[in-house]
Amino acid sequence: MAVKIRLKRMGTKKKPFYRIVVADSRSPRDGRFIETIGTYDPVAEPAQVKIDEELALKWLQNGAKPSDTVRSLLSKQGILEKFHNLKYGK
């Protein structure tokens, strides 16, 4: 089972709100997911991002691949740098 960390769209028309979820790569964007690890609100000024760091690191260590957008959000939060340091022992 290929696992991805990606965005699940919520909210109303023209006012999107996203949950950052861990899901099987074969399931639809807003379909079945394994676990919710955070939220992303691009409409707020500035955009609000809340990610459970422990859960994100756990899933990254288990081999989950983040989507491009989630990768940039994780990077801005400093989580990818921590994952890199854990993986390569720095």
Curated annotation (Swiss-Prot):
Molecular-function annotations in GO: structural constituent of ribosome
Protein name: Small ribosomal subunit protein bS16
Gene Ontology CC terms, in alphabetical order: cytoplasm; small ribosomal subunit
GO biological process, one term: translation
Similarity field: Belongs to the bacterial ribosomal protein bS16 family.
Keyword check for Ribonucleoprotein: yes
Record's keyword terms, sorted: Ribonucleoprotein, Ribosomal protein
One Pfam family hit: Ribosomal_S16
InterPro entries attached to this UniProt entry: Ribosomal_bS16, Ribosomal_bS16_dom_sf
Disulfide bonds: none
Coiled coil spans: none
